[in-house]
Amino acid sequence: MSSDATERPAQRESAAHVRTLVERAQKGDRAALEELYLIHFDRIYGYLHMTVGNRHDAEDLTTQTFLKMLESIGRFRWQSAPFSAWLFRIAHNLSMDHFRSHRRWQPEAEVPEPYDSDEPSAEAEAMQSIGRQSMLELIDTLSHEQQQVLTLKFVFNFANADVAKILDKSEGAIKSLQHRALASLQRQVEEPPS
């Protein structure tokens, strides 16, 4: 891979390197904690921004996510989920706590860009063809769970098994939510309300 300075840290880091960083962080290595923060910050912030709908809350929840990571990293175990799925699970839990305490969603009129934007994604092409505001309106018709699944799958490129762990659901439930969400979006695009 290139060492281009504009390349995102998460794209440069291998699973083996992240594993080494986690092991070092578990032994109290501050530099390893800082590097884990830098590698994952953009993706965690982007996920929370898309989840809670505004920058201020996303910033607060991102800070809380990394504080929880700092408090809990000693208990992290490499079982069936990668470190990033564990970290996203912390972010997801905090966002659910946020929704329970605020009981409302306050979206901004912007959609964050996908993170692997070397090639236009299906999401980007759809946004260009129907417009950002129209896409927001379409996505807003989906259930919160469907929105979460699509975000984790198509914006953050998690596998179904990892999405299931993050959202604490079965892999079958994730596939079903994804299928229903995509079918709903397809129906809405093909048959817009008159």
Where are these regions (language model features)?
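Arg/Lys-rich amphipathic alpha helix in sigma70-family domain 2
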Residues: 71-78, 89-109, 128
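Structural recognition of an alpha-helix C-terminal capping motif at a helix-to-coil junction
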Residues: 60-67, 81-93
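C-terminal edge and immediately downstream basic/flexible tail or linker adjoining helix-turn-helix-like DNA-binding
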Residues: 1-12, 24, 128-129, 134-137, ...
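Sigma70-family region 2
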Residues: 26-27, 53, 64-81, 101-103
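Short, charged helix-capping/linker segments at alpha-helix termini
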Residues: 3, 24-35, 45-64, 171, ...
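Internal acidic/polar
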Residues: 4-5, 14-18, 97, 105-132
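DNA-recognition helix of helix-turn-helix
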Residues: 96, 146, 155, 161, ...
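N-terminal module of bacterial RNA polymerase sigma factors
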Residues: 1-43, 50, 132, 140
